[in-house]
């Protein structure tokens, strides 16, 4: 009987988990140039493999960077990280402190976490904004899961089925990631990101000279578990480009480039290192860095040069000497310890007290005192006031001690004493 109740308790505990696995809510947005955003169960809970399966179920694919840029130009923006082809991004038009760290453009996140939302691209959607309700998941197959599509206008459409083809995604459907907005203090980023802009045509890939790209890095932080991959692109001779903690040197002889590790400056401020990009893009350098895929790859497969903590703006700042672009690290301001501040405050207080004591002592020492000689009996305080008033003129004398130098010689003193003695004798005889 005890076993029965034990199993029943376990069953009740696992029931909410099984129900959660049998229900999936998919919140989708309007389509902009075919691109739309999908959020699962109100939190970041989609893996990269599940993102591809989910877009496939909507008869769509993961969008490329070109398609995201096109959707951005049509007015598409969100405040949620989502997968695209090769990246995790947020499209932003208006700057917001809690969205993409207040940046605009297609903000590319570099992170070591694995669950986000996803973006999908439907090639058959209109080129402009399309907010018609989605009522079906056409490419889903049979399954026990109740899938509910929640449109932007609030309409809901449900069907039973399944779209996940990877068992690890099905088993990990109970994984809960924090639902956070980008740019907040709890952002799921450990290494920062950079923004993909399209309005400064400064870098041209060698395979297609008609599509300009501009990649501006926004945070120079240490990548942990990031993806470095291959870098390349048209660069001039005698140039140096900083690549995610490496420096690629291109000598004047235009031979193979070399990679030299460099240490990024952790100053807490956003620095800018600008690199010159020449018109001649016949010189191609393709270096291999650790990792499987670079977050700076062009969507068409062409390599673009990304500098972490810098912007490629078409002109150079810094000294180029012997084929190297040197940038100086900003000096750090020393911080005053708290104990030193407390000690200085105590010393100042002690100095103020010492000055006050010295001033008070000087006042006391400078006071004048009078010496009163009373010829009456008893103390002055014990006598009556009438007696004191009547005898004040008679009995009180001011005694002045005057130090006078003797002006007479010893012989004169002796003569004066003898004269006095004779006078005293005469007075006694007379009496």
Curated annotation (Swiss-Prot):
Region (Stem): 226-338
Subcellular location: Cell membrane; Cell projection, Microvillus; Secreted
Cytoplasmic side: 360-431
Residues given in the record as hyaluronan binding sites: 43, 80-81, 107
Cystine bridges: 30-131, 55-120, 79-99
Residues linked to a glycan: 27, 59, 102, 112, 122, 174, 182, 256, 325
Region (Required for interaction with EZR, MSN and RDX and for co-localization to microvilli) location: 362-380
SMART domains assigned: LINK
Ranges per topology, Extracellular: 23-338
Free-text domain note: The lectin-like LINK domain is responsible for hyaluronan binding.
Subunit structure: Interacts with PKN2. Interacts with TIAM1 and TIAM2. Interacts with HA, as well as other glycosaminoglycans, collagen, laminin, and fibronectin via its N-terminal segment. Interacts with UNC119. Interacts with PDPN (via extracellular domain); this interaction is required for PDPN-mediated directional migration and regulation of lamellipodia extension/stabilization during cell spreading and migration. Interacts with RDX, EZR and MSN. Interacts with EGFR. Interacts with CD74; this complex is essential for the MIF-induced signaling cascade that results in B cell survival.
Functional summary from the UniProt entry: Cell-surface receptor that plays a role in cell-cell interactions, cell adhesion and migration, helping them to sense and respond to changes in the tissue microenvironment. Participates thereby in a wide variety of cellular functions including the activation, recirculation and homing of T-lymphocytes, hematopoiesis, inflammation and response to bacterial infection.
Name of protein: CD44 antigen
Species for this entry: Mesocricetus auratus (Golden hamster)
């Amino acid at each position: 009987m005890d076993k029965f109740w034990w199993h029943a308790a376990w069953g009740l505990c696992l029931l909410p988990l099984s129900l959660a696995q049998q229900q999936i809510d998919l919140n989708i947005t309007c389509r902009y140039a075919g691109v739309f955003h999908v959020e699962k169960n109100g939190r970041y809970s989609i893996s990269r493999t599940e993102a591809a399966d989910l877009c496939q179920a909507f008869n769509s694919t993961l969008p490329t960077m070109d398609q995201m840029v096109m959707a951005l130009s049509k007015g598409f923006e969100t405040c949620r990280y989502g997968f695209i082809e090769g990246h995790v991004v947020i499209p932003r038009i208006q700057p917001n402190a809690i969205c993409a760290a207040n940046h605009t453009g297609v903000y590319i996140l570099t992170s070591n976490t694995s669950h986000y939302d996803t973006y999908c691209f439907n090639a058959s959607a209109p080129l402009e904004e399309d907010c018609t309700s989605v009522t079906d998941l056409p490419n889903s197959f049979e399954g026990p899961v109740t899938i509910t599509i929640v449109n932007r206008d609030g309409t809901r459409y449900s069907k039973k089925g399944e779209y996940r083809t990877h068992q690890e995604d099905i088993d990990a459907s109970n994984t809960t990631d924090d639902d956070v907005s980008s740019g907040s203090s709890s952002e799921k980023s450990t290494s920062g990101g950079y923004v993909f802009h399209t309005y400064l045509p400064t870098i041209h890939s060698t395979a297609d000279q008609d599509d300009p790209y501009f990649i501006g890095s926004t945070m120079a932080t240490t990548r942990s578990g990031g993806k470095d991959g291959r870098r390349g692109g048209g660069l001039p001779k005698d140039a140096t480009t900083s690549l995610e903690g490496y420096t690629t040197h291109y000598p004047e002889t235009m031979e193979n480039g070399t990679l030299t590790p460099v240490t990024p400056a952790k100053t807490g401020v956003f620095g800018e290192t600008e690199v010159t990009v020449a018109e001649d893009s016949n010189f191609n350098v393709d270096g291999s860095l650790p990792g499987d895929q670079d977050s700076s790859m062009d969507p068409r497969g062409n390599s673009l040069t990304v500098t972490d903590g810098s912007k490629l703006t078409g002109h150079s700042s810094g000294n180029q000497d012997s084929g190297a672009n040197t940038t100086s690290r900003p000096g750090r301001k020393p911080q005053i310890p708290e104990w030193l501040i407390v000690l200085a405050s105590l010393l100042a207080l002690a100095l103020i007290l010492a000055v006050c004591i010295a001033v008070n002592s000087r006042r006391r020492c400078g006071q004048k005192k009078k010496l009163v000689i009373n010829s009456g009996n008893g103390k002055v305080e014990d006598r009556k006031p009438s007696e004191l008033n009547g005898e004040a003129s008679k009995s009180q004398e001011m005694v002045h001690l005057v130090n006078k130098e003797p002006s007479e010689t010893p012989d004169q003193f002796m003569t004066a004493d003898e004269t006095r003695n004779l006078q005293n004798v005469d007075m006694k005889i007379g009496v």
